[in-house]
UniProtKB/Swiss-Prot annotation:
Subunit structure: Homodimer.
The organism's place on the tree of life at top rank: Bacteria
Protein name: Dihydroxy-acid dehydratase
EC number, as in UniProt: 4.2.1.9
EC class: lyase
Catalytic activity: (2R)-2,3-dihydroxy-3-methylbutanoate = 3-methyl-2-oxobutanoate + H2O; (2R,3R)-2,3-dihydroxy-3-methylpentanoate = (S)-3-methyl-2-oxopentanoate + H2O
Gene3D superfamilies: IlvD/EDD C-terminal domain-like (3.50.30.80)
Source taxonomy: Bacteria, Pseudomonadati, Pseudomonadota, Alphaproteobacteria, Hyphomicrobiales
Organism, as annotated: Rhizobium etli (strain CIAT 652)
Pathway listed: Amino-acid biosynthesis; L-isoleucine biosynthesis; L-isoleucine from 2-oxobutanoate: step 3/4; Amino-acid biosynthesis; L-valine biosynthesis; L-valine from pyruvate: step 3/4
Requisite cofactors: [2Fe-2S] cluster; Mg(2+)
Length: 612
């Protein structure tokens, strides 16, 4: 029987000093035999997805104590990718994932916590906490802050649904007046919560449902809706039960590594492909699998992408559909339900809240349950009132979207496309693979060939696009923006948004060893591995080289002979694998430390102490 970890600091004569310090935090004699649960919060006033979390940690803490545990809250950092976008701040986004994972490990191990509730929400926070949970392998429940409501605006007599990306595209479009841009800006992000489309934050929070580490509704219930409070309340009670199951009954099904098995990772990736999730999820799923010592690789993702269809299209792939619409259609449990009906899911994986994922789907999929409670839960609607307050409204849809032929969620028999929403491409330009969000690619450019326009930084590409130097048919290549070369693997939301604003969203391709925001759509291919800084072929591309992209056949090729590539490689080896132009970029010691050990994207950009 495993001993409670906390007894290292709460039991025995020699721990009198530690107990004295625990008492100074408010603990009493009766508390020293209880499980100590870490409430890992990520409140910050910098990030709309986290601005409402201040009191939610203590809400969970009260429920933990009511269930017989001792709750101790601490915070991690949280970077807002949208605010950090387009300047040196984006260099810090991906490295912050590792810092978050490390900080959770440091706090939990230093204080011998028995279990934890992770209160996350935005882009790198959920992945960082997920990595920590699998690294520590103690009972864990995830509960996120929830998505924000979609923006709504009336322009020239027409109502539009909006999100962050619409504001960015409008600002770069010379045809839109300053007044209209202001109106869009003020309406795009109306409430607290993670940005309203199927961007990285919401994608990752949805994947925790498929992994079995969060409660149903975690990925889709709006941050503002009163129904979301139940998830926090239940998480507090559930984590005490999980801790007791493991430490008092030796039930390993309460542990993250048992729950998030290879089969569970396959479920999560199948969901990601079916819902057209952010390409960043691939990076984070690979990193989480690495922490959990799960043999899950790009090859597994490639295999899944060839058999899982696209069952849902949400912004940015479909601009008028947002997370509130996914929730109305039954949320993640209903997408999983359609995958289950198609034989594309591992039903027997355990979860934190049900014996198996199959049991959970049978209860929570709105097309197969008779529960009025479940159906009412998925009728939770946006309130339409700007606010930064959690659980502040109780609006309900009049009905649910159960149309699996033409609705927001489709059946396997009526998919948006037979090919899934994500694909792995390989070829001489990306020997170890790269990722494209096919759900956001227009059918007319699934096969694309064009001359390379080569840029050694995101900044250079942005200047060229805004100066109308990129033309229809071009393939924009942005290199030395990978985990090591950036460093930090910046998101390329501005280049893709500006291509859209110039009317080139369906006429150009963009290839990079960097990554893309979850808000990106178009023929945007990222995570090219190996990256340029690690000697990848992308570092050998020259201006005007022809590049061939074939998504249906999963290939990406540089139309240059092997002999010529060998000559270029020998020349580059002599020069060194770094940008030829001087980049005005403040790479601090902290960023250099990350770059020193960062691997390419095909390994999740995790640190490898043998990388140097």
């Amino acid at each position: 029987m495993p001993a409670y970890r906390s007894r290292t600091t709460t039991h025995g004569r020699n721990m009198a000093g530690a107990r004295g310090l625990w008492r100074a935090t408010g603990m009493k004699d009766s508390d020293f035999g209880k499980p100590i649960i870490a409430v890992v919060n990520s409140f910050t006033q910098f990030v709309p997805g986290h601005v409402h979390l201040k009191d939610l940690g203590q809400l969970v803490a009260r429920e933990i104590e009511a269930a017989g545990g001792v709750a101790k809250e601490f915070n991690t950092i949280a970077v807002d990718d949208g605010i950090a976008m387009g300047h040196d701040g984006m260099l810090y986004s991906l490295p912050s994932r590792e810092l978050i994972a490390d900080s959770v490990e440091y706090m939990v191990n230093a204080h011998c916590a028995d279990a934890m509730v992770c209160i996350s929400n935005c882009d790198k926070i959920t992945p960082g906490m997920l990595m920590a949970s699998l690294r520590l392998n103690i009972p864990t429940v995830f509960v996120s802050g929830g998505p924000m409501e979609a923006g709504k605006v009336v322009l020239h007599g027409k109502t539009h649904a909006l999100d962050l990306v619409d504001a960015m595209v409008a600002a770069a479009d010379d045809k839109i007046s300053d007044e209209d841009v202001k109106v869009i800006e003020r309406s795009a992000c109306p409430t607290c919560g993670s940005c309203s489309g199927m961007f990285t934050a919401n994608s990752m929070n949805c994947l925790t449902e498929a992994l079995g580490l969060s409660l149903p509704g975690n990925g889709s219930t709006l941050a503002t809706h009163a129904d979301r409070k139940r998830l926090f309340v239940e998480a507090g009670h559930l984590i005490v039960d999980l801790a007791r199951r493991y430490y008092e009954q030796d039930d390993v099904k309460a542990l993250p590594r048992t729950i998030a098995s290879k089969q569970a990772f396959e479920n999560a990736m199948a969901l990601d492909i079916a819902m057209g999730g952010s390409t960043n999820t691939v990076l984070h799923i690979l990193a989480a699998a690495h922490e959990g010592e799960v043999d899950f690789t790009m090859a597994d993702i490639d295999a899944l992408s060839r058999r899982v269809p696209c069952l849902s299209k949400v912004a940015p792939a479909k601009s008028d559909v947002h997370m509130e619409d996914v929730h109305r259609a039954g949320g993640i449990m209903s997408i999983l339900g359609e995958l289950d009906k198609g034989g594309l899911l591992n039903r027997d994986c355990p979860t934190v809240h049900a014996e198996t994922l199959g049991d959970a789907i049978d209860r929570w999929d709105i097309t197969r349950t008779n529960s009025d409670t479940v159906r009412n839960f998925y009728r939770a609607a946006p309130g339409g009132i700007p606010t930064q307050v959690a659980f502040s409204q109780e609006a309900r849809w009049d009905d649910l979207d159960t149309d699996r032929q033409n609705g927001v969620i489709r059946s396997v028999e009526h998919p948006f496309s037979k090919d899934g929403g994500l694909a792995v491409l390989k070829g001489n330009l990306a020997i170890d693979g790269c990722i494209v969000k096919t759900a956001g690619v227009d059918e007319s450019i699934l096969k694309f060939s064009g001359p390379a326009r080569v840029f050694e930084s995101q900044d250079g590409s942005v200047k060229a696009i805004l100066a109308n130097e990129v033309k229809a048919g071009d393939v924009v290549v942005i290199r030395y923006e990978g985990p090591k070369g950036g460093p930090g693997m910046q998101e390329m939301l501005y280049p893709t948004s500006y291509l859209k604003s110039k009317g080139l969203g369906k006429a150009c391709a963009l290839i990079t060893d960097g990554r893309f925001s979850g808000g990106t759509s178009g023929l945007s291919i990222g995570h090219v591995s190996p990256e340029a800084a690690n000697g990848g072929t992308i570092g050998l591309v020259r201006e005007g080289d022809m590049i061939d992209i074939d998504i249906p056949n999963r290939t990406i090729s540089l139309r240059v002979s092997e002999a010529e590539l060998a000559d270029r490689r020998a020349e580059q080896d002599g020069k060194g694998w770094h940008p030829t132009e001087v980049r005005k970029r403040n790479v601090t010691t902290a960023l250099k430390a990350y770059a020193a050990f960062a691997t390419s994207a095909d390994r999740g950009a995790v640190r490898d102490l043998n990388a140097r």
